[in-house]
Design a protein with these regions (language model features):
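Chalcogenol-based redox active-site neighborhoods
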Residues: 1-220
Length: 220
């Protein structure tokens, strides 16, 4: 199944380091970030999961649950978490999904249908496409997707920025411009007429071109 933005995130049941979950129920009425990695006990992934552990409070503030995934079993995750805390300085307090039968990785199109049904004997190179991020909204639809090569660690500060943009634009008829950060000016989307925009933004807007209408970020 090919997944795209606005596809419904595949639901699944799985074991995690914090017990079994049913994914959609686990998300509840908030947001979620599902991020995967090719294999436990690998160097780049160790730095990524450690950084995400330190950043978790920022996701908590934004009503967003985070969950890791690899095709290794949960027992391996638990052992590896000790290394992550030792080397990266942050305890992993979010759940990590064990996917030894490759069901979740296949459902999320990170591995092809012909990848098999077991992670046994698979190397990190075999799982090279399993370094992805999915931002999922309260409606269980995919709002954003990112996939990185094995050789490049992800920028989770950018994932947080992307989440903030997704949350803002889900509530207001605006878009965020290049390199936008929370609190900076935004753009009124073309679907909003000038007449409707006047009602929403009585203070007006800057418009270097008719199609480029810039306003202060709406407040929640």
């Amino acid at each position: 199944m090919t997944l795209r933005i606005n596809s419904t995130a595949p639901d699944f049941k799985a074991e995690t380091t914090q017990g079994p979950i049913e994914f959609h129920k686990w998300i509840g009425d908030g947001w979620a970030v599902l991020f995967s990695h090719p294999k436990d006990f690998t160097p780049v992934c160790t730095t990524e999961l450690g950084y995400m552990a330190g950043l978790k409070p920022e996701f908590d503030k934004r009503n967003t649950k985070i969950v890791g995934l690899s095709v290794d079993p949960v027992a391996n995750h638990s052992k590896w978490a000790k290394d992550i805390e030792e080397t990266q300085g942050h305890a992993v307090t979010y759940p990590m999904i064990g996917d030894p039968e490759l069901k979740v990785a296949t459902a999320y199109d990170m591995l092809p249908e012909g990848a098999g049904t077991t992670s046994e004997g698979r190397t990190a190179a075999d799982n090279a496409t399993v370094r992805s991020v999915f931002i999922i909204g309260p409606d269980t639809k995919i709002k954003a997707m990112l996939t990185y090569p094995m050789s490049t660690g992800r920028n989770f500060d950018e994932v947080l920025r992307l989440l903030e943009s997704c949350q803002l634009t889900a509530k207001h008829q605006v878009a965020t411009p290049v390199n936008w950060k929370k609190g900076e000016d935004v753009i009124i989307v073309p679907a909003v007429s000038d007449e409707a925009a006047k009602a929403k933004y009585p203070g007006g807007w800057k418009a270097p071109k008719p199609y480029l209408r810039i306003v202060p970020q709406p407040r929640d």
